[in-house]
Amino acid sequence: MESRASLSILALLLGFSQALSLDQHEHVDITSRILTINNVLLIGFILSLSLCVLLVEGSSELLLEGDILLPKGRNGLVCSDSSCFWKKSSDGLVEVPYTLSSVFSFTDRTVIASAMASFHSKTCVRFVPRTNQTSYLSIESKDGCYSNIGKTGGAQVVSLSRFGCVYYGIIEHELNHALGFYHEHTRSDRDKYVKINWENIDPTTQSNFNLKNTNNLNTLYDYSSVMHYGRTAFSINGLDTITPIPDPSVNIGQRKELSAIDILRINTLYKC
């Protein structure tokens, strides 16, 4: 029993090591990092149950498309009115209150603040420390990188696990979900721009590629969006699950930060 437990812990640590090393390779897009980290941490959560070891704060969540929390207060991911978006104040700024878990180190907090500042410098969105607001982001180190879509009301968790999620681009990705943005590959006109290779996707995960009835804000499909899946997301054989059309050589997925079109969409949605 002891030997089996030791092997399980070793496998877990190796998984963490592989997930964290992704940040060292610029060819790995942000969504691929998120999916890998979430898979590793899910395995860690399962092992922690069997070994009675608490590895991260919080519990395993049911995630859609790899990093989207299914909201409990509304029908699926459908947002039919402005209640899903954060309100603009009279000064023209959109304030998004947040709290930050005490488990984050000074370095973690610096990275999170830097990612938030990127929104401040390019949009009218302002992430502000919560005072007494009812609706706010509760940024915590749970078991993965994930968020709701848009404002759900009350305290809504944005998970940035300290075991791999506290990186500039990943934080931008999850905060952009919280502002109301879906993954780019699920937008309603997706099939004009990419081909989904269903034969390379496990049937149990094909729902991650379902189209959404999205408001595309009269913007172009953005292959370089921070919200775009990488080529092999949810692949069962290492082959591409997403192929750009008509030119399959086009780079897809963002490796660093919000794209110009990501910024345009935020400013358009919130009328900055």
Regions found by a protein language model. Give the residues of each.
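Zinc-dependent metalloendopeptidases
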Residues: 2-272
